[in-house]
Amino acid sequence: MKPNMKIFDSMKNLKKMKRISSVLLLLTTAFVLASCVKINDGEVSELSNLKEEIWCGSEGSRIFGQMYLPGNHSGKLPTVILSHSSSLTHAAMAGYADLLALHGYASYCFDFRGGSKESLSEGNVDDMTLFTEIEDLKTVMKTISALDYVDKSRIYLMGSSLGGVVSALVAEEMPASVSGLILFYPAFNISSLVNGFSGFPGMETAFTQSLKDYDIMEHIGNYPGPVLIIQGTKDFIVPPSVAEEASVKYKNAELHLIEGANHGFNKANLGTFGSFVSAEYDDIVMPLVYDWLEK
């Protein structure tokens, strides 16, 4: 019996069509997957941020930091410099920097020299004091303000806890260089906290010694620019009364109390406490920041 050639041809065509369909399916799948892949750091997209490593200062005392930029930016940008809490690093503020960049701000977060054992900046933990951190922030401001894409007339300082204290004190020294202050649970009571632990083993450090006779509240309040203070009502380190007292000292301050929030609005900023304390307040906090910046 002779084979039916039409049947063979039909089968061959069917196989060919299946192969073509398979190739098309693979190409379509690859395209869909590629569109879902996260853009790597350093790539520019209208929907993503550009992250750039920038070092400040001179050899031997260099300060590590990362700049977040809107992916489609052009011209001069308003800029926010973010200072982290005690014993943390730039990583604690990176999420905020990323969000600010999405809203059109150049945002730089950095490691204080000796700020923690995980710090990428040069410097020793044993040498860190409030005043070395003040000098660090001033060094950072000098470097960042000189960048081509930074609008020097719109530089804001944002800090959490000790970083908030440092930002506030730098603004007192350099009011003309600071367009505004954003302070998350600023530890203006840190001197009394340090004095409360005086004499305990391991507490006699350069940092604690430098704060014993230094009342921070006496050194703030003269900065004439706008100040935003955001404070948790359940903060176990900085009571709301501290933020309330500070807000009265400033001539142009806005205070927001976040009900139930502790000393950190997310796990990254709670440090070791983030493992067992619930903290997801960024969705409440950051819209306050955006609105304030746009005023």
Indicate where each model-derived feature is located.
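Active-site glycine-rich loops that stabilize anionic/oxyanionic intermediates
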Residues: 77, 84-88, 233
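Conserved alpha/beta-hydrolase
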Residues: 99-122
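N-terminal cap/lid segment of alpha/beta-hydrolase-fold proteins
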Residues: 39-74
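C-terminal catalytic histidine-bearing segment of alpha/beta-hydrolase fold enzymes
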Residues: 253-295
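Alpha/beta-hydrolase active-site loop
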Residues: 92, 126-148
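Mobile cap/lid helix-loop segments that gate and shape the active-site cleft of serine hydrolases
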Residues: 186-219
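The serine-hydrolase catalytic nucleophile loop
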Residues: 86-98, 112, 241
